[in-house]
Amino acid sequence: MSTEEQNGGGQKSLDDRQGEESQKGETSERETTATESGNESKSVEKEGGETQEKPKQPHVTYYNEEQYKQFIAQARVTSGKYSLQDFQILRTLGTGSFGRVHLIRSRHNGRYYAMKVLKKEIVVRLKQVEHTNDERLMLSIVTHPFIIRMWGTFQDAQQIFMIMDYIEGGELFSLLRKSQRFPNPVAKFYAAEVCLALEYLHSKDIIYRDLKPENILLDKNGHIKITDFGFAKYVPDVTYTLCGTPDYIAPEVVSTKPYNKSIDWWSFGILIYEMLAGYTPFYDSNTMKTYEKILNAELRFPPFFNEDVKDLLSRLITRDLSQRLGNLQNGTEDVKNHPWFKEVVWEKLLSRNIETPYEPPIQQGQGDTSQFDKYPEEDINYGVQGEDPYADLFRDF
């Protein structure tokens, strides 16, 4: 669904079931959790609305000032390129607690984009200012075939606007739910593309921190695009912040220990497990029990998992950081060289010169919304001028 790609190619199906549902917005079926500076203890919602407190933890990321200067020097300027008048708002693609995502069309080049709109007052009230600014920064730095592209940002007195690629094929999550589970070659294909995206992010000292099927979109050809960088962060050494989606959170995060890129490889293992099994290994309807299982439960496999994938997952979903693949001396190479990935030609995959296992049934080319749910449209009040009490908090937008 990249705004730079041309439509084409025949339609393929996976188990004769087709992916649909909403363009990725700010929230999804499995809610994320986060702490931020000034909000160090986290209330974790339980079934029935009860809450339990997670332990307080420091909000610290270790790096020196010179390192950070070199990192942000890579960033593209995102503000000043566009304004609301440059686009026609067509329909809502997704909604969330911070705002909504719209399908828009440029009045200049006719291309379709996704516009993520966040309400400043809500972002501030929910203490997500740092994560919102980090999302803009990370997306202004990354450029990769399997990662969403942000084209620019702007703001008014009440909202923040982020202009992104529009990805027509929908969420991997939707396809997985319709398919119940993926055959081994299909899961391997998506996992390999995710692996390359993680390798790229980690090469820039960015940890993603919220890997799950809901945050993976499929373009018109069936290749992935990782989206939603709200929890991504520059971490050259270690950090402490509790964030992520409970089923996917690594044990070192749950136990409030310092962590680094290792947490993405744990989540990568959970992703592979869910794609193959149709469920996550430590799921419980009670979030606190999920955390307990992550810390203590034995990793069990369905009988149809083959030996190679069981070996890979046992090396990814391990609490021993000295044994977790991706976190060892050879980094991502240890993951890519595992026998489960032996058929993957990584160079061809990176160049997208490989047939995908599923091609979304897009009929009308760019701007097609057939893979997304419909949302009730609301009267919008964008472009508000006047006093902005939060101007200093979002100055880079």
From Swiss-Prot:
Biological source species: Saccharomyces cerevisiae (strain ATCC 204508 / S288c) (Baker's yeast)
Name of encoding gene: TPK1
Enzyme Commission number: 2.7.11.11
GO terms (BP aspect): cell division; double-strand break repair via nonhomologous end joining; negative regulation of cytoplasmic mRNA processing body assembly; protein import into nucleus; protein kinase A signaling; Ras protein signal transduction; regulation of macroautophagy; signal transduction
Database matches in PROSITE patterns: AGC_KINASE_CTER (PS51285), PROTEIN_KINASE_ATP (PS00107), PROTEIN_KINASE_DOM (PS50011), PROTEIN_KINASE_ST (PS00108)
GO cellular component: cAMP-dependent protein kinase complex; chromatin; cytoplasm; cytosol; nucleus
Similarity comment: family membership: Belongs to the protein kinase superfamily. AGC Ser/Thr protein kinase family. cAMP subfamily.
Compositionally biased residues, Basic and acidic residues: 13-33, 42-56
Protein name: cAMP-dependent protein kinase type 1
Activity regulation, per record: Activated by cAMP.
Domain AGC-kinase C-terminal: 342-397
Gene3D superfamilies with a match to the protein in the record: Phosphorylase Kinase, domain 1, Transferase(Phosphotransferase) domain 1
Compartments reported by the entry: Cytoplasm; Nucleus
